[in-house]
Amino acid sequence: MHQMNIEKRIITRRDFIKISAAWLTWSISFFPMRLGGLSRSTPSAGLLDALSGARLSPQAGVDLPPGQQGRVLVNNVSIYDRPSEFGEKVNAYWFDSILPISQVTASPETESHNPIWYRVGSEGYVHSGSVQPVRTILQQPNSEIPAGGILAEVTVPFTDARWSPGKEQQVAYRFYYETTYWVIQLVYDESNTPWYSVLDDKWELVFYVPATHMRLIPAEELAPLSPAVPPGSKKLEVNLREQILVAYEMDEPVYMARVATGARFSTGNYSTPPGWHMTFHKRPSRHMARGNLAANGYDLPGVPWNSYITESGIAIHGTYWHNNFGRPRSHGCINLTPKAAKWVYRWTMPVVPPDQQSAYENYGTLVEIREE
C-alpha cells in the first residue's frame, strides 16, 4: 500500500521542474519537447514514463539524418576517441570549421548540466557545448519581395555579408545559420550572380548576401501558435536554478526548453532579474551590439526571435554563439536555441505582423522568473 501511494503521488512544482530538467539534459539541440496532455497534477510515475522514451542511451546514442553538420564556436576544439574529456585527443579544429555530425550521445563522464556529445563522422567525438548544429540548404533566389521588405533566415553554416554585391567585395559581417534579417531587394552583381540586399536594423546600413544562402520566411510560418487559447491563460516560467523554460496553457505545461540566463562576471552582476515580467516588445531579428561601431564588446547581427521582458533590453531570444545551455552565461537575457526561441516568439503576445519588424504594446504574455 505504501509503495502504491508513492507511485501515484501528485508531483509538486519543484518535482515537475526537476523531472523536466533531467529530461532536457538528454535532449539538447535535436529533440524539442512538447508536453501536450501533461500537467503538474500528472502522477509522477506517469510523467517519467512519458519522458523516458525520448532519453538517450549513453551507450548507443542516436543516429542523425544525413547532412547534419556542426560549426565550431570556439577558437579551437578537441576531438576525442570517446565521448569524454578523459578520452584520447585525436584531432582539433578551429573556429568556424564545419564538421560532419552523424550521432548524438550522452556521456556519464561529463559535467552534469550538459553531457551531450556529437560523433564527428568516423573520426571521434566533440562536446556539444562548443558546436552549433547546422545544415547546408541552398535556396532558389526569389525576386518577389514586398515593397517594405521580408524576413529571411540564413540556411547555410555561415555566409559573408558584403558592402556591395560581388564575392570580391569587402566583407562587412559574417552571418550564421538560423540568424534572421530583413531583406529588401534582389540584385545581381557583374557576373549575374543574385544577392539579397539586407537592411541592418541597428546601424541602418545595407549589406549584401548571396541569395542562395537565405530563405525568405512565408507569412504562415510566423502565424501565432495556440491562437484559440485565451492570452490570459498563457504563461512562461523560467527557473533560474534548473535553467529551464516551461510554457503553460490553462496551467498545463505544453513546451519546455533549456536556457542560459544572466550570469555574474568580473565586470559585474548580469543575473536575470527574478519576478513577474511581460513580453511587451518583440522583434523577429535584432542586431545586438554594446556601444557604437568603435566600442569594444559584443557585436551580434541577426539575433533571432526576440521577446523583450524589460525596458532595459532583457529578452528571450535565439543564440548562435554558444550551444551550452543549462548554466548561466549571458548578460541578462534568456538564451535559447533558435528553434526554441522561435516557438516562444510565435506563442507569446503581442503578435508581430509578418510585414513589420517589431511590435511594442502595453500588454503581453506573463513571464515568471523563479529562483527555484
Name what the model sees in each region.
Residues M1-D15, I19-F30, G37-S41:
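N-terminal secretory signal peptides
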Residues P83-F95, P165-Y177:
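SH3/SH3-like (including bacterial SH3b) beta-barrel domains
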Residues F30-P83:
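C-terminal segment of N-terminal export signals and the immediately downstream linker at the start
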Residues V229-P231, Y255, T267-P274, H281, ...:
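Exported/periplasmic cell-wall-interacting domains
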Residues Y188-W195, L199-P274:
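Cell wall/extracellular polymer interaction/catalysis modules
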Residues T42-D63, Y118-A152, L199-P231:
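Boundary regions of SH3-family modules and the immediately adjacent low-complexity/disordered segments
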Residues N75-S84, F158-G166:
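Short, structured beta-strand/loop micro-motifs enriched in basic residues and often containing a Trp
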Residues A45, V90-Q132, Y176-T212:
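SH3/SH3-like beta-barrel superfamily modules
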